[in-house]
Amino acid sequence: MLRRLLGLTRPQPNSQLRLAWLKKRGWLAAHLTGSVPQAPRKPHIESVAAATDSLGPQALAAEYGEVGGTRTPAVVRSSSRCGDLYAWLVQQRSPATIVEFGAAFGVSGMYFSAGLEASGAGHLYSFEINPEWAEIAERNIGSISTRFTLTRGAFEDRVADVVKGPIDIALVDAIHQYDFVMRQFTILERRMSPGGIVLLDDIDFDRPGARMREVWQDLAGRPDVAGAVEVQGRLGIIELSASRRT
């Protein structure tokens, strides 16, 4: 306790990230290295995530098409390293508006919110189609910040009613299927600010018919994408051109 009060605690080691660049240009290329600091309030976030995982398997939403299907919170959560990256992006970019879909159990939302609290500005809009998962996510994110709105419903159905301004950072992490993600991206890109950052989780999802690797490659190859990098073999990040118009 005395060491904490005197500011003598050891600095926490940075998270090391494995990067694979597809387009090494733009803001991402200038600022993103293979190392980011640990997120603010990380011990609390990971403690909440562990408590959530102890709830055991939770039923999937009907939209996933798996009758009787379940997932454990640990399987669908963002990794702690990616969480550090999310908080770092927020602190570096100072976004006014972050959007994520789906929220799952709120781990990514907690990391985004930790970055917003550290920055002292901005708002997270989170969407989750599973009402039971949404309740847990809302409670978890609320343990970090009040700078968020959690909407029960699909992004593509509700975004026009909920998010009024341009989106600066977006996390796409809902149903992992090529056509579904592409339809969501078509809606999302019209609302992104110039130079905005889009994160695509689970690009390594290889269930038959998912084609998530193909989604990532097609989006990264677009001419209006300034930078594109793969993180930990799982997360794709694209930086939209600063000259594009919303």
Regions found by a protein language model. Give the residues of each.
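A short alpha-helical cap/connector motif
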Residues: 1-171, 175-246
